[in-house]
Amino acid sequence: MVVVSTRYEFSQHFDFPAAEAFSWCTDYDPKDHNLMGNKGYRKVTRVSDDTVILEDTLYPQGKAVTKKKLIKIDGERMTYFNFHLTGSNKNSLYFYRVIPEGDRKSRLEYTGYELTYPKRAPTKRQLAATAEADAATRTKKWGRLAKAMERELRGKRS
């Protein structure tokens, strides 16, 4: 079995204080995939104040793909971990940290430690291209989420 480990990272700016952005990011909902532009649904099970199990079903290329994820939330540090228990990225870990940028703005720092299981080992060039494409996809999705955050949180302030 071939196992490929890839690390990638990006950041996403938010026009909201860090605590408010962190709270929004960790408030999981069955409709989250719609916010990211995905066709799919999510089952959210709150195990404890700092632990959530997500069961996501998505439809890339029209075929159902289900992933189960363990989320660990550290509100004091404004960090959370997303560990994939099942699916094509089984045993992958994603780390999120919301950092204050003054009193009214913040940014999300994201690092993905992703495992994939291809039939054949990719070349270094293929690995680099995959990491770049994955980061671009996640950046695009987080851009959509930032816009959704803007709509929801600005609406609450009005």
Language model segments and positions:
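Glycine-rich portal/gate segments that line the openings of hydrophobic small-molecule binding cavities
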Residues: 29-33, 40-86, 144-156
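A short, structured loop/turn motif at beta-sheet edges
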Residues: 15-19, 46-49, 72-77, 97-107
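Solvent-exposed residues in well-ordered beta-strands and their adjoining turns
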Residues: 13-17, 59, 99-101, 111-117, ...
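Hydrophobic ligand-binding cavity/cleft-lining segments
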Residues: 1-51
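Hydrophobic pocket/interface hotspot
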Residues: 20-25, 70, 108-110, 145
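Beta-strand/loop substructures that line and gate deep hydrophobic ligand-binding cavities in soluble
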Residues: 84-140, 155
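Short amphipathic alpha-helical segments
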Residues: 17-20, 24, 133-141
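Hydrophobic/aromatic beta-strand elements that line small-molecule binding cavities or substrate pockets
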Residues: 10-12, 42, 65-72, 82-84, ...
